[in-house]
């Protein structure tokens, strides 16, 4: 894929960039694999905002993605590569030999017409899925399971890739895109290769309206609010926050403070925390 820039004729397009969508081969999704999802817009079942700065945005159809890759031993051919409005990665439509169709995350370098398979002893080729114990050291993978059979949860964003750095006993050591190094069972499955659309990280939004298309609302700074709305609020004119450190609207340390809970069961699996 590539990035397309606009000629600088308006403030909204001066620094804006978009994908050229050169890898997309089909415009309409597979109807049997799409359905409507009622978006929560940051509200819970009582209508109370639980996640701020969400709402609006363009309507979307959800594409059902196969994160489990559990059609063992049945080869599939890549039919199309499509755009998915629900993620920054592209998706690939697979036609299996038994007639079933499924979407997967599009791995970088996988083309229409390529054949892939999920198998215990599948060749270590881009797009194939197999257990971590059968992938050699240094191998690059994505869509990695945390629990065997639970479906891929790690390294699923555009351009994401995890690397196998060690194997010991029934555990495999992975270096994740965040910089975290953690242990995973060698029975967990993963897909070989890197997620496509690697230039997604280099996109420049360019204008506020484009964020609204994505369903993201303005993020108002606490320092410009009233004291009743935020701990940073109040004062005459432009005032400092008046505290030793920045805090959230609920008084919790923010802006750099680590928020992971201590003494979690998974701490023993994390060898090095994320950067």
From Swiss-Prot:
Belongs to the universal ribosomal protein uL2 family. GO terms for biological process: mitochondrial translation. It is found in: Plastid, Chloroplast. Pfam families: Ribosomal_L2, Ribosomal_L2_C. This is Large ribosomal subunit protein uL2c. The keyword Chloroplast applies. Coiled coil: none annotated. SMART domains: Ribosomal_L2, Ribosomal_L2_C. It comes from the Eukaryota. Part of the 50S ribosomal subunit. Residues 225-275 are annotated as: Disordered. Its main location: plastid. GO terms for molecular function: rRNA binding; structural constituent of ribosome; transferase activity. GO terms for cellular component: chloroplast; mitochondrial large ribosomal subunit. Keywords: Chloroplast, Plastid, Ribonucleoprotein, Ribosomal protein.
